[in-house]
Amino acid sequence: MATITPSSISNAWLIPGASFTVKKSDCSIKCSFSRKAGKQILSSTQRLVLPLSTSLRLFPTHGRQFVLHPHRRATGTDVVAAVEEQDSTPVVAEDKETVASEKSDAPAPTSQSRGTARPGRKSEMPAVKNEELVPGATFTGKVRAIQPFGAFVDFGAFTDGLVHVSQLSDNFVKDVSSVVTIGQEVKVRLVEADIESKRISLTMRENDDPPKRQSGGSDKPRSGGKRDGSKGGGQRKGEGFNSKFAKGQMLDGVVKNLTRSGAFITIGEGEEGFLPTAEEADDGIGSMMMGGSSLQAGQEVKVRVLRIARGRVTLTMKEEDDGKFDETTTQGVVHTATNPFMLAFRKNEEIAAFLDKREEEAEKPPVETPVEPEAEASVTSAEVEESVCVPAEVTSEEVPSSETPKVVEEEVIATKAEDDSPEKEEQTETLAAAAEAEEVVPPIPETKSEEEIVENSIPPNSATDEVSSPEALASEEVEKEQVVAETPVDEVKTPAPVVTEASSEESGNTATAESIKGISPALVKQLREETGAGMMDCKNALSESEGDMVKAQEYLRKKGLASADKKASRATSEGRIGAYIHDSRIGVLLEVNCETDFVSRGDIFKELVDDLAMQVAACPQVEYLVTEDVSEEIVKKEKEIEMQKEDLLSKPEQIREKIVDGRIKKRLDSLALLEQPYIKDDKVIVKDLVKQRIATIGENIKVKRFVRYTLGEGLEKKSQDFAAEVAAQTAAKPKAKEEPKAEEAKEAVASPPTTVVSAALVKQLREETGAGMMDCKKALAATGGDLEKAQEFLRKKGLSSADKKSSRLASEGRIGSYIHDSRIGVLIEVNCETDFVGRSEKFKELVDDLAMQAVANPQVQYVSIEDIPEEIKQKEKEIEMQREDLLSKPENIREKIVEGRISKRLGEWALLEQPYIKDDSVLVKDLVKQTVATLGENIKVRRFVKFTLGEDN
């Protein structure tokens, strides 16, 4: 609140922080206060006469803020402290615009002095001579400065030209910065150039006629630049700012953009209004507490026209009745609140209406009834709640009372007669404190406001309503204001079970309900964030553990694990297939099932699948899901080995059995995925992690199967002895000298005349085939420069070289995967000779295409026909031989027909025999050979595995 200090000069009041506007030398001087100053208005009896000269001497710092307006007022000079609202930003901007426009029309000497203030002005645009400054001429310039009344453009003339805000566009322009920015290149047209006063007027409008504008401007000479204030002002107010809206009109609008002081609302075709922050529905609480407005761009809002000033429409989201609360505040009626959140509740429309309704019910005269022990206990508990609302200054006053001990003794006897439990003794102490609070309340001074007295007469269930009202009426504010339900609420809640009942069961249920209500929402939210359980589960857990977070977490974990065990019997037909590839050398394909497709697409389930796939990749010893999947033969074999160890021979038979079982269990647990410690938290086992997710999601989850590939496992790399290879290659051979001569002679005879091959043909063939330069040159020379024949020559040579390279050992390569819609997944391993080729882009593309090929062919089960077991081939052959259409055929012909049918049938099961999905004219095996010819290394598709969601293993 702004402080008012007396001054010895003319007995005037000095008001810091106030801005003054002088309407005229003999008019009233108004002092503006912001909302932060308390919104207090001085009454008419407090107006003081202050001469203009004295006021000017008292406030020298505000000398430049005085604006003279020609409207005559009363002859007296009054200082009025008026309540100015925060939505005055547009009006202030208009005043600044008026001042600036008046300054722009100042006399010529002022403009000249302004022009001479910067003689060394440097222009970035080409120089424009004064002879070229003809009205209607078009120039290109850059925006140098932006003012509320227009923009200054540098186009190379002797000074910057002014584009008035009304000349920026053919449409209405509210904000200059929304049309142009500093440094922007714009196209302008000259309206007027006054070389003597060094002023240039420009326009950016396209529909105006320059001669008419010039003739209109030349009707009145610019002698000194003065305006007829009375005529001009009347015309602007009367004609230029006609609005089609009326004060108090309700409109539907859309938020256009947001500023610090408010928001601009589109309320019609081309019409906009300004909504100050203080006129929003929440009184600007969102901007103060959250750091920004509660509105968003594009949001549809319902607004009311608050006022129309100079064509500018100021809007509000409040109803007309909201002003009554401000009037009562300025008249000295102040609500008593125990903390700032109560004030925030009072500013909210819905909560304030609820509190007012409750206060109206409290003001009704109570019905006089005989006080019974139960009623007396409830009344005293209500008095305890009233004492929470009493200010600290009032409760700190100690008023002696001789009747208090007697009342306390009677209440103690009444409560002990009903229940002698320790809880009742604590309640008795609370009642004693309530009785003291009751005696303290009467001496409150009469100067207290009506609102404060009403709050002290809140009914007994007010504390409970205060706890539940943020959840019921303003659920969106509970997270911001959870501190409201902390220590004061807990203190009020403890005497709640004072009302005793005859039945012990009813009292137990009431105590449970009250204990659940007494849990702080902040604790519930914290427990939800830490455990991921439901709100009611967290509430029940906190009530069971009496607010202890650790015990509540243990309670939820036990309950979650128990519910997970119950849900383990449910069927799981949906789920997700995931994959994890580590450095293209370790690959995992995993299937996890759940009950519904909705859960399988959730983020929690996706994260679980990814974590389990990573877990499999991180545990190389894992081979099974659970220990039950291990075959009995392996268990028996392990048991026999353990029983024969020397350290157990000296043990008794019974102890030996237990030791062996423990060792075998430990060994089997190391092979099972669900028994491994979780890699992100080694205190949790994987199966417990799955149970936690079951408790969180509420559906059964099962890890169905997984496959793990390690690059090159099972392959024996050939040990290379370079010394032996070099010695073998350089060893003398008897026929080596004679054979080359014969070959050279044959080549000399058979070689055709050499043709000249151009470098352009070699380059074109290299781009089309990807072969080496010498290979392309030889191919063109052999085919006489024919590109098509050269391509065939290279393809045949490449395939033949690929066949030669197929005998090389391929132990490097890449592991890839492809997941289609999380329902079909493929894990594939493709080998090559060196790691360099395995990391090349061409090889990566081949692996990805082969994985996609395997997904696109559901009947494919093997890599090649040679990988199909002989049992399956024999079975297919027997089936084909027994067909009726072959019984009449001769034996020789029947064999050939069966072989053809079997090869076709087996080709459908082999991946390499399928037509390539991106080019069905090429088989997959031919694609691999082409890649071998391009990369120059042997490539082998070693293995792949395919999972389809829901299929049997």
From Swiss-Prot:
Record domain S1 motif: where: 136-205, 248-318
Protein name: Polyprotein of EF-Ts, chloroplastic
Presequence boundaries: 1-80
Protein's gene: PETs
UniProt feature, compositional bias: Polar residues: 458-467, 501-513
Gene3D superfamilies (UniProt xref): 1.10.286.20, DNA helicase RuvA subunit, C-terminal domain, Elongation factor Ts, dimerisation domain, Nucleic acid-binding proteins
Keywords of this entry: Chloroplast, Elongation factor, Plastid, Protein biosynthesis, Repeat, Transit peptide
HAMAP family found in the cross-reference section: EF_Ts (MF_00050)
Residue stretches of biased makeup (Basic and acidic residues): 93-105, 121-130, 201-212, 219-230, 416-427, 735-747
PANTHER family, sorted: ELONGATION FACTOR TS (PTHR11741), POLYPROTEIN OF EF-TS, CHLOROPLASTIC (PTHR11741:SF10)
Pfam families: EF_TS, S1
Disruption phenotype: Defective embryo arrested at globular stage.
Upper classification of the organism: Eukaryota, Viridiplantae, Streptophyta, Embryophyta, Tracheophyta
Biased composition (Low complexity): 369-405
